[in-house]
UniProtKB/Swiss-Prot annotation:
Gene: rpmB
InterPro entries the UniProt entry points to: Ribosomal_bL28, Ribosomal_bL28/bL31-like_sf, Ribosomal_bL28_bact-type, Ribosomal_bL28_sf
Domain of life, per lineage: Bacteria
GO cellular component: cytosolic large ribosomal subunit
Similarity comment text for this entry: Belongs to the bacterial ribosomal protein bL28 family.
Protein name in the entry: Large ribosomal subunit protein bL28
GO molecular function: structural constituent of ribosome
Keyword terms: Ribonucleoprotein, Ribosomal protein
GO BP field: translation
């Protein structure tokens, strides 16, 4: 498996290890990935992801998976996350029509 966050497409990054004498040696910064199951309250479904802890902290800050997906720009999300976001928007639009809520 590649070391990529399945929600944000974040990948390993490259930089320098700098010693006390200021010598620079190339190094790789790896992600702290964990397998997690996240629950969507709107869709009433569970989704399994391999997510970076940084992303998991952001989801916790936003409140839940639904809020994270709806408040994050689509460009920053992976294809899998974009598909779930589209489903969320569809269900929310359907609920608004059923309740008779209009934007005007």
């Amino acid at each position: 498996m590649s070391r990529v966050c399945e929600l944000t497409n974040r990948k390993k990054s490259f930089g320098n290890k700098v010693s006390h004498s200021n010598r620079k040696a190339k190094r790789i910064f790896l992600l702290n990935l964990h397998n997690v199951t996240l629950i969507s309250n709107i869709l009433n479904k569970k989704f399994k992801f391999r997510v970076a802890i940084r992303t998991l902290r952001t989801i916790d800050y936003k409140g839940n998976l639904d809020a994270f997906l709806l408040n994050t720009r689509t460009v920053k999300l992976s294809k899998k996350a974009q598909k779930i976001k589209r489903k969320l928007k569809k269900v929310l639009a359907k609920q608004e029509v059923e309740l008779g809520i209009s934007d005007a």
